[in-house]
């Protein structure tokens, strides 16, 4: 099967997984098949040669997230970093007054997956978060905000968990897990070249919110929302 056919099959499965008209079983089956096919494609497409040859394929993209560090934007970019790491990419970010700019380094194929799964996540989580908020009680607005942030971070963690489980199952006894680990390390080294990257402080976590988000993220039918893998990135509001 050619690369283009594999990618189209992955996209078709992910469209089914995100189709609200499909049954839960159909969406879950499509999602699992898409994840396994994606992981297998990533493994089989690993380039040959030494590390320096593979470094040539390293590149970067930027994602702008609207909102200050005190808004939901900080939780979204934290989730993006979690998702990027699960796909062997390294994410750092710079905070501005009204937005955050994340820079993600990795191979072109891995960055394409990060982009599409990220786009799917930011479309999917708001309605699920709204459902959770309807049944939750809070003593203060700050507690409510902490729950919302924690939920978003947990949602991305749930998606990353599924990717990592599928990757482990596919790379068992093949040695390719070491190659993927090396790919992340090279992405991190590439990001740090000539830059003094300061790691952000952890946000205060609401454990119930994080656990709820992680369950929903793991169980979500994340679809392939975007067909365009190149070109400028569109700022995504984080309210």
For the regions a language model picked out, list residue spans one by one:
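Long alpha-helical, hydrophobic tracts
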Residues: 1-61
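Long, charge-patterned amphipathic interaction tracts in eukaryotic proteins
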Residues: 5, 39-239
